[in-house]
A protein has these predicted regions:
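Membrane-embedded hydrophobic alpha-helical segments
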Residues: 2-51
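An amphipathic alpha-helical interaction surface
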Residues: 2-9, 91-224
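Terminal, low-complexity, charged helical segments
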Residues: 12-19, 28, 66-79, 104-105, ...
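Residues that form generic nucleotide/phosphate-binding pockets
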Residues: 14, 63, 217, 221
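A generic structural signal for solvent-exposed, polar alpha-helical segments
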Residues: 21-24, 56, 63, 197
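Transmembrane helix-loop junctions and nearby membrane-interface residues
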Residues: 34, 38-44, 51, 70-73, ...
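Amphipathic, membrane-active segments
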Residues: 45-87
Length: 224
């Protein structure tokens, strides 16, 4: 009986001990604050990922739309002759707000500031390709990353080929050469083969994205 009374007295003393309650409340407050902070960090990370995925998706969708709009012309069977329309096709593939800064580069290749803008846009596309593979999940991420990479490479090969065409014209004027002679003089056939290979790559990449409904799968991943 005495032992029970002592226990009760101890309990009463604890209830009267303001330091104990202050410590307990402080501890609980710290735990609650930590939990809220972790929840806020998690929500912030999800929001950041959502924004990155959305921005990336919109840029990719723009590339897909440009290719789709010009698909028939880009995939037409090529004759065994120089591709003199490469500058026009370059303009088709850069005809949106994301790529418009690079479009002028094909008119006067290697001349600044257009050349520098084109280099910057190439780096942005490379970054977009890498980012897409990192922030999206599954095979769709790899598939769309390859499409972006092939898109960038096609623009680069078109740019190189336009430089070659300009050199070929200069060669023809300087040496009063025929078209065939000018082609051989600047090794046009080899450069054309590389460009045609880039056309084939983007065609296959676009087919893979379309056939596997990659854009729809990426869209489903854009959520908080």
């Amino acid at each position: 009986m005495i032992r029970v009374l002592n226990i009760n007295e101890n309990i009463l003393e604890i209830f009267k001990d303001w330091n104990f309650w202050l410590s307990l409340i402080t501890g609980l407050t710290a735990v609650i604050a930590l939990v809220l902070t972790l929840m806020q960090i998690r929500l912030s990370n999800k929001q950041s990922l959502f924004e990155r995925r959305l921005e990336c998706y919109l840029k990719i969708d723009g590339l897909m739309q440009l290719y789709k709009e010009n698909q028939k012309l880009l995939e037409t069977e090529r004759k065994d002759e120089p591709l003199f329309a490469v500058d026009l096709e370059f303009l088709w593939l850069t005809n949106n707000t994301y790529l418009e800064e690079a479009s002028e580069a094909i008119k006067k290749p290697l001349e600044n500031p257009e050349h520098k803008k084109f280099l910057v846009k190439r780096e942005e596309l490379k970054k977009l390709s890498a980012e897409a593979e990192l922030i999206f999940k599954g095979r769709s991420a790899k598939t769309i990353s390859c499409f972006i990479s092939d898109y960038e490479q096609l623009l680069f090969k078109m740019y190189q080929y336009q430089i070659l065409l300009n050199n070929m014209r200069n060669y023809s004027e300087q040496f009063k050469a025929t078209l065939e002679m000018a082609q051989k003089g600047v090794n046009e056939t080899a450069y054309r083969e590389k460009l045609l290979h880039a056309y084939a790559n983007i065609k296959m990449a676009y087919l893979q994205v379309s056939k596997n409904h990659v854009m729809e799968k990426l869209k489903k991943q854009i959520k908080l």
